[in-house]
Curated annotation (Swiss-Prot):
Family: Belongs to the glutamyl-tRNA reductase family.
Residue ranges of the TM segments: none
Site (Important for activity): 99
PROSITE patterns attached to this UniProt entry: GLUTR
UniProt-annotated catalytic positions: 50 (nucleophile)
Function: Catalyzes the NADPH-dependent reduction of glutamyl-tRNA(Glu) to glutamate 1-semialdehyde (GSA).
Binding site for NADP(+): 189-194
Name this protein carries in UniProt: Glutamyl-tRNA reductase
Keyword NADP: yes
EC number of the protein: 1.2.1.70
Record-linked NCBIfam families: hemA
InterPro entries per record: 4pyrrol_synth_GluRdtase, 4pyrrol_synth_GluRdtase_dimer, 4pyrrol_synth_GluRdtase_N, GluRdtase_CS, GluRdtase_dimer_dom_sf, GluRdtase_N_sf, NAD(P)-bd_dom_sf, Shikm_DH/Glu-tRNA_Rdtase
Length: 425
């Protein structure tokens, strides 16, 4: 009983290869349905994101190997010219489980501890379940992976601390002003970086966000998306600087959008009430001399990257704890897999003894009263339970390797003269 994982990710292939081999949700469903309907797989799931496309397959025949699945996906995407098997990784048995646990707990992510991947794994499982491609093995594997991710999030700090510039800026603002909901925020620039910063602010309960941008319609669109509907014309935002506790700049410009003189006047109007300026521009948007002003907190990208580097160091320090959780769950999953392998023998063993019991009781059915027969049946049930306890316990006992399972199964089948499974079914 095998679970194979093959795929490409940020470790094995450049982005152009990952893009070429990725699957949309429609393609995902079509691909795994084809694997099942063609008799190649009992179960199948595909995780497909910008950083990875990975297959998780329970093969239905020995010919379905890792190499076979690589070629099958390449052929499905008609990508033989661009994609080669060397771009793929392969995992088998518990290696597959370990890999999915590492992916789900975000230690295999491009950015260590990036929590978005768990939702993507859950989406992959949902898609597989919707087309009836997730059976007992994948269902147990995925739910164990979800459990691993939950334990990692609650028992370690692998996902704590900002690791993007925009989020680091917001996290810093929250450390200085603990309650962002009470602060008035000006966002200068509604591009990708500014948009991310605004959305992170919104997630931290900041609601009083005013947006200005050279193209007013872009500012209005972002304001509407956030639900603030507060904008300022780019030509006049400097007239209102004194009203804001936090100013975020994220524009493409060769000239400073805020000068030391302008912010000196602003601080006078505010009576030195503290202001945070988060300069997310490259080149810098803000005159660095502003940092010399009293009660003015200025942080640029370099300062924020220093925070990010420290956070990544802290996350890396949590890896031993994460790996310990994964190891514990991997052992439990492996033991569960082993019980599946011995279950047919346990069922056959119980069935044989029940059949013997029923034949022997049938001989006395008309020789004793119903009460006596019931007592005999109760007694024989107890005897059978005790007789079968040790061989069943031996079959279920933890083992060092999967290779020991056939020897145990064969021993029990030979001792109790059980037919081979393929002769019975």
């Amino acid at each position: 009983m095998n679970i194979i994982s093959v795929g490409v990710n940020h470790k094995t292939a450049p982005i152009e290869i990952r893009e070429r081999i990725s699957l949309s949700e429609v393609q995902n469903k079509e691909f795994i349905t084809d694997l099942i309907s063609s008799g190649l797989a009992h179960e199948a799931m595909v995780i497909s994101t910008c950083n990875r496309t990975e297959l998780y397959v329970v093969p239905a025949m020995h010919e379905v190997t890792g190499e076979y699945l690589k070629e099958y996906l390449i052929a499905y995407k008609d990508a033989r010219k661009e994609v080669r098997p060397e771009h793929f990784f392969s995992r088998f048995y518990c290696g597959t489980a370990r890999h999915l646990f590492e992916v789900s707990s975000a230690i295999d992510s491009l950015i260590l501890g990036e929590g978005q991947i768990l939702g993507q794994v859950k989406d992959a499982y949902r898609i597989s379940a919707e087309v009836q491609a997730a059976g007992i093995l994948l269902t147990r594997l995925c739910h164990t992976a979800f459990s691993v991710a939950k334990k990692v999030k609650t028992k370690t700090k692998i996902m704590e601390g900002a690791v993007s510039v925009s989020y680091a800026a917001v996290e810093l603002a929250q450390k200085i002003f603990s309650n962002l909901s009470m602060k008035k925020i000006l966002l200068i620039g509604a591009g990708e970086t500014g948009e991310l910063a605004a959305k992170h602010m919104f997630q931290k309960n900041a609601r009083n966000i005013v947006i200005t941008n050279r193209t007013l319609s872009k500012a209005e669109a972002l304001a509407e998306e956030l639900g603030t509907k507060k904008v300022l014309p780019f030509e006049s935002y400097k007239d209102y600087l004194h009203e804001f506790d936090i100013i975020i700049t994220a524009v493409s410009t060769k000239e400073y959008v805020l000068s030391e003189a302008e912010m000196h006047q602003t601080m006078m109007k505010r009576r030195l009430k503290p202001v945070i300026i988060l300069d997310l521009g490259l080149p810098r948007n803000v005159d660095p001399d502003i940092a010399k002003l009293q009660n003015m907190f200025l942080k640029d990208i370099d300062a924020l990257k220093h925070i990010i580097d420290k956070n990544l160091e802290r996350r890396s320090a949590e890896l031993p704890k994460v790996n310990a959780i994964i190891e514990e769950e991997l052992i439990a999953f492996g033991q569960w897999i082993n019980t599946l392998k011995v279950r047919p023998t346990i069922v056959d063993l119980q069935s044989k003894f029940i059949e013997i019991k029923e034949k022997e009781l049938e001989r006395y059915r008309y020789k004793v009263s119903e009460d006596e027969l019931a007592r005999m049946e109760h007694l024989t049930d107890r005897i059978l339970k005790k007789i079968l306890h040790h061989p069943i316990k031996m079959l279920k006992a933890p083992i060092d390797t999967a290779n020991n399972i056939p020897s145990r199964v064969n021993l029990v089948r030979n001792v109790f003269d059980l037919e081979e499974p393929n002769q019975q079914h």
